[in-house]
Amino acid sequence: MAVQKHTVALFLAVALVAGPAASYAADAGYAPATPATPAAPATAATPATPATPATPAAVPSGKATTEEQKLIEKINAGFKAAVAAAAVVPPADKYKTFVETFGTATNKAFVEGLASGYADQSKNQLTSKLDAALKLAYEAAQGATPEAKYDAYVATLTEALRVIAGTLEVHAVKPAAEEVKVGAIPAAEVQLIDKVDAAYRTAATAANAAPANDKFTVFENTFNNAIKVSLGAAYDSYKFIPTLVAAVKQAYAAKQATAPEVKYTVSETALKKAVTAMSEAEKEATPAAAATATPTPAAATATATPAAAYATATPAAATATATPAAATATPAAAGGYKV
């Protein structure tokens, strides 16, 4: 089933200017048949003293505090501009227009960041995150038509940017449902995206405050608990789409790495894939088809939820389930992911 067309909501401000009101007499153009004796003119009233103009309200500024946060705010703004630009071109040109507009905005943001003294190390870290997000989006953009390709690209990039913003604890407006409505995803899937996204943000925040050697453990425990609490009764029964199951296995496999920070960063990358995978749910023909594609009950027991994957998979199982391609790609992407 082709990716359904997303609804792009653009809020256009329309200024309605009213003309001055005219009197009925002037409109009719009539003069009295018998002019009345004019009344004595009234004493002119003393003009009132003009009120002091109110001080214009200050334009609210962004809430970002670090250079990384300021940069991701600009990237988010570029995302919005790219969506707006793509909305006014023919379907066949949407993908190209979005990529070009977003690329220009991103490059401009990095140039401005360097001009303001943004540290090269931090820039490289954020660049790595953004590159990984763009790669995920590009891989997802496999629609049958140019517009479907654009829709898949934007939906996946949206979720990837949300995760990056969550990692950086950015308080700016995130490029999510305001502009791009992923209407083809079932309501349950949308709720799950939000729950995993919230759990991820909670875990990333907790891990950021932990010592380097404890980051992965803190992240894992916090994420597991948040998922279990948010899913409630569905915790033991919910079947994720196959792509998500594979990503969760990869996240668990990260525990086999030797360095604590490597375990944490590889897990971050894998969970980012997990969140973006859910934005591709519209590619499934039907919810039933997605359930059919879910691994066997035995495998699902170990991987149906992030917490289950962490808690029940053994090191040997993790080694067996992580595909060679994923295992090869993840460490390379992890290089710039120090949070």
From Swiss-Prot:
Residues 1-25 form the signal peptide. Disulfide bonds: none annotated. Residues 285-334 are annotated as: 6 X 9 AA approximate tandem repeats of T-A-T-A-T-P-A-A-A. Residues 36-65 are annotated as: Disordered. Residues 36-58 have a biased composition (Low complexity). Sequence repeats lie at residues 32-34, 35-37, 38-40, 41-43, 44-46, 47-49, 50-52, 53-55, 56-58, 285-290, 292-300, 301-309, 310-318, 319-327, 328-334. The keyword Transmembrane helix does not apply. InterPro entries: Poa_pIX/Phl_pVI, Pollen_allergen/Os. Residues 32-58 are annotated as: 9 X 3 AA tandem repeats of [PA]-A-[TA]. Pollen, starch granules. Pfam families: Pollen_allerg_2. Keywords: Allergen, Repeat, Signal. Belongs to the Poa p IX/Phl p VI allergen family. This is Major pollen allergen Lol p 5b. It comes from Lolium perenne.
